[in-house]
């Protein structure tokens, strides 16, 4: 999935750059687009499941400034028995080319909304998650 963000004044903090907390918003926005594009949210609701982030590991590589144009990309990295991990990048696009300004690994589980407990990732859910492994052409190799 790909989300485009142009940095405006409301993204900037008192130090004239994008605060680290904003990166999390950009990452989450792309994950929502990622799930919406594949109708995953409706499927999860129908199956009484909630996707919950349990760990986010973010690397801040370069600062982001007013006027920067960013692309956020997401792909599934690993599917385990009870959790899965997606990999994300924020890429700055400028006249000189593109560069990664941040990357992140997000680990998440699925909660059964009836029992309020994490579930084992069964074959059906694994198939749905495997669809998110495609579309990695926009990534920049680190």
Language model regions located:
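Hot-dog-fold acyl-thioester-processing enzymes
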Residues: 1-55, 112-142
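HotDog/MaoC-like acyl-thioester-processing domains
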Residues: 1-3, 60, 64-66, 77-142
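Hydrophobic beta-strand-centered segment that forms part of the acyl-chain substrate-binding groove
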Residues: 34-84, 99-102
């Amino acid at each position: 999935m790909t989300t485009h963000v142009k940095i405006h004044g409301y993204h900037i903090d008192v130090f004239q750059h994008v605060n680290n907390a904003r990166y999390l918003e950009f990452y989450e926005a792309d994950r929502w687009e990622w799930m919406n594009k594949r109708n995953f949210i409706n499927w999860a609701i129908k199956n009484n499941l909630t996707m919950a982030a349990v760990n986010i590991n973010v690397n801040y590589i370069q600062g982001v400034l007013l006027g920067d144009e960013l692309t956020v990309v997401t792909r599934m990295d690993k599917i385990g028995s009870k959790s899965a991990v997606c990999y994300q990048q924020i890429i700055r696009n400028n006249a000189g080319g593109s560069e990664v300004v941040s990357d992140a690994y997000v680990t998440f589980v699925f909660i059964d909304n009836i029992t309020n407990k994490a579930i084992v990732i069964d074959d059906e859910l694994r198939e749905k998650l495997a669809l998110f492994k495609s579309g990695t052409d926009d990534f920049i190799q680190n």
